[in-house]
Amino acid sequence: MVKQVFAAFPQGSAAGPEKFRGQAAMAGRRARWDLAITGGQPPLRPLRPPVLYRAPLPRTKLEASVPDGQVTGMLEIDGRTVAVSGWRGTVGHNWGSEHADSWVWLHAADFGAAPEAWLDLVLARIRVGPARSPWTAMGALSLAGDRIVLGGLGRRLRVDARPGRLTADVPSPRARLQLSVTTDDGDPVAVPYTDPRGGSRTVRHAALASVELIVRRPGDRALTLSSSRGAYEYGTRRDMPGIVPQPLPEG
């Protein structure tokens, strides 16, 4: 995964929601990509109730334009070309005036017992004056075409979120989700995110996280799912001991 920040998109580049084309250079290495993504599912707007998209808080809004899609095209890394055909992928973006104080973004697919399933979940704490809010969860789990809304305002959850791992118990109207996430120390990258209001956040992103889920729904037996193809992002305004963020790549 490559994250870039531009005052304007370079000539010839494209950035979604259906087409991605660009290049980046960092630490003597170069990458180029030309990718298309298609998906038959409606976008996911996880903030609930929907009035939050018009409210002053939270100051970051987000959407998964393509919560689950198929990616085709090509990647080129240091001159080596990789053909991409039928890869699972997702497209999302966020906007606003201030990053959350701390957050987790988790996306997972290719669960062995339910290969069509996908999970897209955001956990966040925001700052209101001098205080920090409790963790709030918002997102969805898709099972057999049924999109189960997760979390929401006022729902108490248990969260232990760290740069390299996560455990959480997320209640929702139709299900309760227990999840754990672990990442390999050699997989992630860490970068700084500049905050529109000043300062920055340190963000650690792992693109090959292991995800374990237990889904409990009224009247059904508990369903256990696992995937080794999760994307786990942890961001915070606090320092991460032993983690030094690297500058974002040049276009």
Each language-model region and where it sits:
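Structured soluble/peripheral alpha/beta segments that form catalytic or ligand/cofactor-binding pockets
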Residues: 1-251
